[in-house]
Amino acid sequence: MGRKFEYRYSFTDAALMEIKWSSKALSDLARLYAFLAPVNMLAAARTVQSLVAAPNSLLMNSRIGEQLDEFKPRDVRRILVGQYEMRYEIQDAVIYVLRLWHTREAR
């Protein structure tokens, strides 16, 4: 007899998460744009757009980023977006984008 395969896809709680940007992260975006725009305005706009879109990938897998032990017990993590580091914190159903910067910046 043939086997019957059934595939079910169900959304987890992660699908119900939302993204919020801290004021410092928004300032970081403005700072990065201001730094890049005088050289190439189009590249600056594309960079900011990719950084703004990046956290959307976290909605389905919020724990994909590397956890930063120095912030425990908070759940602070980091991901790399091209040559930029983005730090975020998971609190209940909210992903807070905390800070972002170019990896070559002195931090």
What do the predicted segments below correspond to?
Residues 2-12, 81-107:
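Enriched for short, Lys/Arg-rich terminal
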Residues 4-76, 94:
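Basic, Lys/Arg-enriched alpha-helical interface segments
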